[in-house]
């Protein structure tokens, strides 16, 4: 595993275009995207430092020894001033880009040391590149989605067996592991009855009863790429009102998919689904965006919402 030169060159090109001479990447997913290495350092600092002049470093604690990465690795002790050590390798007097998750305790220390003339949130540089999926990435995501489909197919018959929502999540993990996934891509939402009205319900010890709608918001991770899906099923019987609403949502889904063509804007896709639900009298209950981008993380930069005027592309996966 080593630095992906093609991806690195695209990042460096974007840095030059935006006048950012030095970039600090701390997001583990973005570091993984560029280096093939995912490290969870907990509260400790890890930074992939990129310089348009080519002086790249990966700065990380000694507790996390790294293999050959195609970039020099700089280690610090837990008792060291890790930011000062990072700063010692940086050039002074330039605009510095940091990513959106770098903790203030590190950024403020870097500013105190007077390294840069300006500091900006430069997550967009890697985010924009990650948004464009290669053919290989698309294939990996198809495989993850197919596995997720199989997992959902095996989970649905269990909704009427008396398991609690939490137990259903455990059953789903067993299913994923048996199918060859690495695990959940996010904590699953299994919601029976009234709980299903909460888009981000925290699964609890509730059990289902005849007539309940059951929301299954589930996803797995396979070979480093995520799947995410939401399905609604019913236990035993379906009321006329529930059937009507289900069909409205399904038609809105179809209209959104039909609108998702290259050249359209993401807000057009959102509107295609939202306008139909509003037309049918349920617009006030559509409280969320239509979709979000996905890849190495289950929620990545980019979404299908009413304010996203970016153009749809075959290489953007939502």
Describe each PLM feature range.
Residues 1-317:
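Active-site neighborhoods and metal-handling regions in enzymes and metal-associated proteins
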């Amino acid at each position: 595993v080593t630095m992906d030169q093609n991806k690195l060159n695209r990042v460096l090109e974007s840095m030059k275009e935006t006048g950012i001479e030095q970039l600090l990447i701390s997001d583990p997913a973005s570091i993984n995207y560029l280096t093939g290495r995912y490290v969870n350092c907990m509260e400790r600092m890890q930074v992939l430092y990129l310089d348009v002049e080519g002086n790249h470093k990966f700065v990380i604690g000694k507790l996390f020894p790294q293999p050959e990465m195609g970039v020099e690795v700089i280690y610090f002790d837990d008792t060291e001033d890790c930011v000062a050590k990072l700063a010692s390798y940086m050039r002074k007097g330039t605009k510095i880009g940091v990513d959106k998750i770098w903790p203030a305790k590190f950024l403020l220390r870097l500013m105190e040391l007077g390294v840069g003339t300006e500091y900006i949130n430069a997550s967009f540089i890697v985010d924009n590149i990650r948004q464009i999926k290669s053919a290989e990435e698309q294939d990996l995501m198809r495989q993850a989605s197919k596995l997720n489909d199989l997992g959902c197919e095996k989970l649905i018959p269990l909704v009427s067996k008396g398991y609690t929502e939490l137990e259903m999540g455990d059953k789903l993990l067993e299913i994923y592991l048996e199918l060859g996934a690495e695990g959940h891509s996010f904590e699953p939402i299994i919601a029976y009855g009234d709980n299903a009205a909460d888009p981000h319900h925290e699964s609890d010890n509730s059990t289902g009863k005849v007539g309940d709608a059951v929301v299954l918001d589930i996803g797995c991770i396979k070979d480093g790429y995520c799947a995410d899906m939401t399905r609604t099923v019913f236990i035993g019987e379906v009321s006329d009102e529930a059937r009507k609403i289900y069909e409205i949502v399904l038609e809105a889904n179809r209209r959104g998919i039909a609108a998702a063509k290259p050249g359209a804007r993401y807000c057009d896709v959102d509107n295609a689904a939202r306008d139909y639900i509003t037309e049918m009298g349920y617009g006030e209950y559509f409280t969320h965006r239509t979709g979000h981008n996905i890849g190495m993380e289950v929620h990545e930069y980019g979404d299908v919402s009413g304010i996203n005027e970016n153009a749809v592309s075959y290489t953007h996966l939502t």
